[in-house]
Amino acid sequence: MRIVVESDPTLFAAKHLIKRLNDFKPSESKKYFVLGIPSYEGSAQRIFDYLIQEHKKGNVSFKNVATFQLDEFYKIEKTHPFSMCTVMYRNFFKIVDILPENVHILDSKTLDPDAETRNFEARIKEYGGIDFLFCGVGSDGSVARNEPGASLASRTRLKTLAIVTLQKLSSRLKLSVNSVPKVALTMGLGTILDAKEIMVLFLGQEKSMALNRSVESSVNHMCPASVFQLHDRCLFVCDEKATMEMSSKTVRYFNGIGKVAHEILGDKNACDFAKSSNASELKLFHRRMLSRNK
């Protein structure tokens, strides 16, 4: 796990994602870079906006990209204004050059949720798995629609939403609690962990306890985001307010890793340091970290 604390975390996250997209070279055996993506809302909204901005400038293309949406509300029309399908097509997919057949969103009107979720998992496998997944985290540590108590090994499935979630949806959508969707189709935590690389955003003081429990506490189903401790290539992108509940020692430690990585790698992306195969670089990195921690 890596943690970076940025003054503009969404800009950092967007640039990191664009680098991954531009580094991808399609081949006969691997035609598409596969993204797992959240909805166009909250902290992710600015990332999508920046992707659109850079696409219009010609700095990034989505022709060789396939996407899998993290979740979708169940039993609402695809044209409903709250549907992920409507929101994502209106604000992102219709603007960039992604091929429609490479956009995958769970069917909100399916009559057989079990079959739909199995087919969704099968489609991910057909593409060779998710290469890069990014998401935000709820103040309770929820990931997609995996709320506290969710199985850490869960797959894509139908999930009843907690009353706290319904109240937040009610406030955000300006509807009564009785009017908001109460069930959703969602990628499971096990499905999410299968992604080759994961980037998670923690923004604002309201996410500080979730960050603390995700990093400094044990892996626990009551904080779903803590499961990211088990992933070998997971990056947490935070602002300073989100670190308020973490110990200063932990924050200094991860800031130190970032600074040393920048010193050693120069213009290389410091987030790529974990992939470095240069033994001398790794030895130098560890020596510097040990000397700083004395």
Language model: regions and residue ranges:
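Short beta-strand segments
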Residues: 37-39, 69, 106-107, 134-137, ...
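A glycine-rich beta-strand to alpha-helix segment
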Residues: 33-43, 47, 123-148, 269-290
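ATP/nucleoside-binding phosphotransfer catalytic cores, i.e., glycine-rich phosphate-binding loops
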Residues: 190, 194-294
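A short secondary-structure junction signal
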Residues: 115-117, 143-149, 154-156, 210-214, ...
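A glycine- and small-aliphatic-rich helix-loop capping segment at beta-alpha/alpha-beta transitions
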Residues: 49-61, 84-90, 148-158, 217
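Ligand-binding beta-strand-loop-alpha-helix segment within the catalytic cores
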Residues: 60-134, 254-269, 273-277
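N-terminal glycine-/serine-/threonine-rich phosphate-binding loop
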Residues: 1-36, 53, 268, 294
